[in-house]
């Protein structure tokens, strides 16, 4: 059976792994998932990640905890296959008053809402992380 929304699956795997206090979580890999993991690492939400290109490419995400609690409080999918959400540069959301990030897919690649605003770009809102 094919997966309908791989990004939502990635977010769910991260959410479930943190709920079970796992150190790492593995999932099928894709270029977009690796780009999302890179954004999460740059923003300090995960410790790191590694992408293995074997017969079945796998992405392993190293989760981050602070004083025993997960750093990622909420991670949710916004734009989905059945309802794409696009925003112009001046309409990009401020997640939790600037404490969280919105992952935005722009013409220059995946970036945070802050980086997209600075670059003057809008795009598809992939999800919110806080």
UniProtKB/Swiss-Prot annotation:
What the protein does?
One of the primary rRNA binding proteins, it binds directly to 16S rRNA central domain where it helps coordinate assembly of the platform of the 30S subunit.
Which cysteines form disulfides? none
Q: How does it assemble?
A: Part of the 30S ribosomal subunit. Contacts proteins S5 and S12.
Query: What Gene Ontology biological process does one annotation of this record name?
Result: translation
What family is this?
Belongs to the universal ribosomal protein uS8 family.
- PROSITE patterns assigned to the protein according to its UniProt record, in alphabetical order: RIBOSOMAL_S8
Q: Please give the GO cellular component terms listed in this UniProt entry.
A: ribonucleoprotein complex; ribosome
This chain belongs to which protein, by name? Answer: Small ribosomal subunit protein uS8
Among its keywords, does the record have Ribosomal protein?
Answer: yes
Which HAMAP family does its entry note? Ribosomal_uS8_B
Q: Which gene encodes it?
A: rpsH
Q: The organism sits in which domain of life?
A: Bacteria
Cite the InterPro entries for this sequence: Ribosomal_uS8, Ribosomal_uS8_CS, Ribosomal_uS8_sf
Organism this protein belongs to: Idiomarina loihiensis (strain ATCC BAA-735 / DSM 15497 / L2-TR)
Q: Which GO terms describe its molecular function?
A: rRNA binding; structural constituent of ribosome
Q: Identify the keywords attached in UniProt to this record, alphabetized.
A: Ribonucleoprotein, Ribosomal protein, RNA-binding, rRNA-binding
């Amino acid at each position: 059976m094919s997966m309908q929304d791989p990004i939502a699956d990635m977010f769910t795997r991260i959410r479930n792994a943190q709920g079970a206090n796992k150190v790492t979580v593995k999932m099928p890999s894709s270029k977009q998932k690796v780009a999302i993991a890179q954004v999460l690492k740059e923003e300090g939400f995960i410790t790191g990640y590694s992408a293995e290109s074997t017969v079945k490419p796998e992405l392993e995400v190293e989760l981050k905890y602070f004083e025993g609690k997960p750093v990622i409080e909420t991670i949710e999918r916004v734009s989905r296959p059945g309802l794409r959400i696009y925003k112009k540069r001046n309409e990009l959301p401020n997640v939790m008053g600037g404490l969280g990030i919105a992952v935005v897919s722009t013409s220059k690649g995946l970036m945070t809402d802050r980086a997209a605003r600075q670059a003057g770009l809008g795009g598809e809102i992939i999800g919110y992380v806080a």
